[in-house]
């Protein structure tokens, strides 16, 4: 007979009782998939790697940025950490990027005249944007893909973009907190093999637009989850605030919650009224005080009035879509 992974979990628990052994105190207690009552599709365990690494750092070290696929109980295949345009999209101009030896100590050392200008409206205003993402971003203006991050995972970097557009216009951003353990939302970090990373996105634009609580942010992939009853949904928010963020050496059976991204989410006419407002995080929350890609140009980030934003859980939410209308 065929034993499912859920039956295997139950049998292993019985075996522990029979032999008198007990699981390690570091082993998280994994709930049953039937405990989940929300709108997400649930997967469990490690994904199958379909792309081993999207990026090699030419100068220094970088975390492996793989892409995987995992199938839920209904047979739907999910891409983790998210579908992306890193390999094919237009790359943003490097503000600070160690792998390309672009390491200016201040904005005065940056040749901003070399930044290419993406055209949304030929007769529009030319706007410059300064972006720092932990880890990865894809920027759309009125549905047009303007630029993608030049580093999917690490080392931390920052970028400049330029585009011509007429007001009003819509900024839409896909942000991804990358993962080493594909499908499990975690990485080998802080002495644990399965430790959840954190995200964060901040940007300012030359027309005065800055990231803040008036932006919208919706979650589309949350992991690692060990107790599915910790997930909830209230007023459009996909919440995981009651879920543990502690690292472990035994996280291979963690769950993940997935929501389908709308095909036209980046378009100006997309209706995002049901999406919650973005959550704001401090520089200490994101941990950028030792990141030169941020600190060397802080006048264009928090110094310009911008705030770090994400969804309601900057640790467990790994794929987030952001939107903002500039009037």
Give the ranges of each region predicted by the language model.
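Bacterial N-terminal signal peptides that target proteins for export
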Residues: 1-10
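C-terminal motif of bacterial Sec signal peptides marking the signal peptidase cleavage site
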Residues: 18-20
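Short, surface-exposed beta-strand/strand-loop-strand elements in extracellular ectodomains
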Residues: 136-146
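A general, composition-driven signal for non-globular sequence regions
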Residues: 1, 145, 162-163
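Short beta-strand segments within Ig-like beta-sandwich modules, predominantly Fibronectin type-III
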Residues: 147-154
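Hydrophobic helical h-region of N-terminal Sec-dependent signal peptides
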Residues: 11-15
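Bacterial signal peptide processing site
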Residues: 22-24
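Beta-strand-rich recognition domains
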Residues: 27-137, 156-327
